[in-house]
Amino acid sequence: MAQLPPRAPSAAAAAGQEWSAMAAAGEFLGFAAARRGAHRRSASDSAAFLMEAAVPMDDVIVGVGGGGEFDRLDDEQLMSMFSDVEAPAVSDGGGERGPAGEAHLMDMGDGDDGMGATSPAGAGAMAAAAAAAAADGIADPKRVKRILANRQSAQRSRVRKLQYISELERSVTTLQMEVSALSPRVAFLDHQRSLLTVGNSHLKQRIAALAQDKIFKDAHQEALKKEIERLRQVYHQQQIKATGGADIATAASMQAKHELLACEGAAMR
């Protein structure tokens, strides 16, 4: 009996394979989105993720066979999707987040095994793409150097900030010590100024009183001078009048002399 050629796949089988390929690609993109949501990203990485998430499904899925779903994704997109898994372990050097990335890759492998029951070719393509992206993320020296340079720059900035803060604290402490040392002297000088102000006010009052007394004494001296001049005129008039008796003239002269001496004594006091 002649060997018949294999039967062409039915429309239902082709539709099932296409649906399996689309489901595998959707799960891969969902895994990348979950990995990006689990870490804090910068504004540029978020924009890149949005641009990557906006890729249509028709560009990701090549054919119905399910063997080339990720051939349209370039190396940068794959490395950006899996950079959160491997890059921190390389840059930190301590492997703090490496086990977490491996666990996620293992979880993804488990999911791929579950999908392999329906689409083995799609699961194999996903595993190959994940391994290639992880290898590219590890072997990219420029990205590692950029991450290390950014972290070193941030570390230097933190060190400079701490040094500046410590210098400011030392300056504040020094100024506070100077203020504490100068405060008693300032208080003493303020007290001395208050005492000098009170003394100056007393001196001003005394100067005003002495000026008033001087005015009174000047007026009294002027009055005495006028009285002396009047007595001298009287004495000369009595000397001129010699027609009177000698006793009267002598008595008048003596009286005038006594009055003159009394006025001069009062003026001297």
From Swiss-Prot:
Name what induces it. Answer: By white light.
One matching Pfam family: bZIP_1
Give this protein's Gene Ontology molecular function annotations. DNA binding; DNA-binding transcription factor activity
Q: Which domain of life is it from?
A: Eukaryota
List localization entries: Nucleus
Q: Where is this region: Leucine-zipper?
A: 168-196
In this chain the bZIP domain maps to 140-196
Transcription regulation as UniProt keyword: yes
| Role summary | Transcription regulator.
What name appears for this protein in its UniProt entry? Basic leucine zipper 19
Supply the source organism for this entry: Oryza sativa subsp. japonica (Rice)
What gene name is listed for this protein?
BZIP19
